[in-house]
Design a protein with these regions (language model features):
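TPR/TPR-like (Sel1-like) alpha-helical repeat modules
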Residues: 133-156
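Flexible helix-coil transition and linker loops at the boundaries of alpha-helical arrays
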Residues: 35-38, 75-82, 113-116, 155
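Amphipathic alpha-helical segments of tetratricopeptide repeats
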Residues: 72-75, 110-114, 149-150
Length: 178
């Protein structure tokens, strides 16, 4: 849910954008880097991302990954210059997390941190921290989950398994747990 307007985020880009300070999403109307992409290319990437989002909603994570990677492959080089790369890598890492492929999630979300507006984005830090936790990398998990908590507050964790927030409370004082 977008804390600013109370609306539910309907796709991965919205979720990432509503949980980030500056969010890795941009639209042609905002005049950010996606506006610099050729309109046809922007539409193709957006359509693939939307298709991936729909597959995620249906629980078809492998199918979603195919769509997200296809969109990512369309980005011009260097891919790390594009905010679209941020939200595509975030969506890929999110799908990895839901597939319980935590090593791939860690790797892809770690790679996402090299893209614009990724560092400091609470959603990215949340998913990266969750992957680190599941892999047993507890110090790294605590660091990433704290970044997520500091940027997104306890509400960022509302729809997540309570074990992540309970774990964070063992590592830091003042963590609000349900």
């Amino acid at each position: 849910v977008n804390a600013q307007d109370g609306k539910t985020a309907h796709n991965r880009r919205d979720r990432i954008a509503t949980t980030g300070r500056t969010g890795p999403i941009s639209t042609p109307e905002q005049g950010l880097d996606m506006a610099e992409l050729d309109n046809a290319l922007y539409e193709r990437i957006g359509a693939l991302s939307d298709a991936g989002d729909a597959l995620m909603e249906d629980g078809d994570y492998a199918g979603a990954l195919e769509k997200f990677w296809a969109g990512f492959d369309l980005l011009p080089e260097p891919k790390t210059n594009w905010e679209a790369g941020t939200w595509l890598m975030a969506a890929i890492g999110d799908a990895n997390f839901y597939q319980e492929d935590y090593a791939a999630g860690r790797d892809n979300l770690g790679e996402a941190m090299h893209f614009p507006n990724a560092i400091g984005n609470p959603f990215l830090h949340l998913r990266l921290g969750q992957c680190q936790f599941e892999l047993g990398n507890l110090d790294r998990a605590a660091d990433e989950l704290m970044r997520a908590y500091m940027g997104g507050g306890p509400e960022l964790f509302e729809d997540e398994d309570g074990k992540y927030l309970r774990f964070l409370a063992t590592r830091a004082e003042g963590i609000e747990t349900p």
